[in-house]
Amino acid sequence: MADREGLNGPLSRPEVLDLLGEGRDLSGANLAGISLVGLDLSGASLREANLSDADLTQVNLSSAALQGANLTRACLSLANLAGADLRQCHMERAVVREADLRRATMLWVDLRSADLRLANLTEADLRGARLSNADFRLAVLSAANLSEALLWDTNFERAILQEARLVGADMSRARCSGAIMWDADLTDANVVNADFSDVDLRQTMITTDQLAKAGSLEGAHYQGEQSLRLRLLRGLSLGRRKG
């Protein structure tokens, strides 16, 4: 069995397979640029591993320990990350399209400018995450926790955010057109210049004072006691745009 220092140099796919076969902990391993397409790494220990620019397409990383790992620019399309621990991971500009991130632990993860289109993040914990300029179009974030997350210029167009928690999140200039935010909690969220056009805001916890600062409310859907006040706000929003 190779000693611990052997993990510091770049590893090849065959070497990774051998180490996994030996039950080795790959925490801190240098896997930059490696292709691990389609491998079963479920439950693997990859804490603080360097996986920058790695091709992890369709890799099974369910329940894997990836705390603090470097996944910058990595390709994780169609990967299974359900239940994985991604706390404090660096995932800037990563491609995570159609990935399964259900119930993943993603506190303080850095996903700036990442592509998460069509990804499933149901019940994922993204508290304090850095998600500015990330692309969540058509993604599923039902019951996800995005409290205190940084969502500047983030794209949530046609995403499902039903029952999501966005308490204290900074959604400045976020693009939410066509999103479903039914029963979401936006208490104390910053929505300055956010686009809520055609958004389903029924039962959403958000104040009219917050929405008065939004960029657009055209076609937004709401009901109950909020309805009249939000209709008036939508008119004010449209008036500002025309002016």
Feature names for model-found ranges:
Residues D3-G243:
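Tandem repeat scaffolds
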